[in-house]
């Protein structure tokens, strides 16, 4: 059923992940991010943003 992909997931300081969030191998979530419940994170998230959706997209800047 395909090959295994192993890569670290990095979650920055002060980030929050909602319930049932999925993060794909190798993704970095920047500091101060909020990931909405049920989101699927398939690419890196820039710091201080609100991300939601499938796939997750930046929907709001949270400031510093």
Question: What positions do the PLM features span?
Answer:
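Flexible, glycine/small-residue-enriched loop-and-beta-strand segment within the central core
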Residues: 1-27, 54-55, 60-63
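Short, surface-exposed helix/turn micro-motifs that flank interaction/cofactor sites
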Residues: 16, 34-36, 52
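Beta-rich strand-turn-strand
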Residues: 20-34, 39-42
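Acidic, glycine-centered active-site loop in nucleotide-sugar glycosyltransferases
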Residues: 45-47, 52-55
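Short amphipathic alpha-helical segments
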Residues: 47, 63-64
């Amino acid at each position: 059923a395909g090959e295994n992909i192993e890569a670290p997931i990095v979650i920055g300081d002060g980030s929050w992940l909602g319930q049932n969030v999925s993060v794909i191998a190798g993704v970095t979530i920047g500091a101060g991010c909020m990931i909405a419940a049920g989101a699927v994170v398939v690419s890196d998230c820039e710091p201080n943003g609100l991300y939601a959706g499938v796939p997750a997209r930046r929907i709001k800047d949270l400031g510093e």
